[in-house]
Amino acid sequence: FFKNREITKIDTLLSLTGFSLVGGPAYNSSKEAENALSLLGVPYLAAHAIEFQNLSQWAKSDGGLSPVETTILVALPELDGATNPTVFGGRLGEEGGCSCCSEKRNGKEKSYDMVPCFERVNSLAEKTYNLVKLRKREVADKKVGIILYGFPPNAGAIGTAAYLSVFHSLFNTLKAMK
């Protein structure tokens, strides 16, 4: 559907399902997702509407997403290769949703209705647009910041990570950008 013979017809794949690309909320097949994404060769972004709390509860929460939401809405899509997890909406709730959007509502929504957070939808659209723009920019014109992990500090552990060849990967990345 996203390809015309060998040519990919999309610049980015944006999933709004709130769970794994291949499977569902209770099952995922990261291998099948990896195969599909490899064939497309485009970035994969996953955004989601929160399900287990309403927008107002989420906005007021010190903890953000619940552990179940974090697993289903963030971790499973990331296993597939998704980036940029973003909340774009959720249930309105008795409080009327998020404070940034209450004036934009038509007043006909019920507390249990799923509604967008317009501010976050606009932010998601802007991030997606900028990612597409960045991918189309010449490699030599891209500006890249590199952060290397170093823990414990002052112990000569810069660039260490379990089961990862950090400097080899960094070298290959920089070489590809030359």
Question: For each predicted feature, which ranges?
Answer:
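An N-terminal assembly and electron-transfer interface module characteristic of large anaerobic redox
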Residues: F1-K178
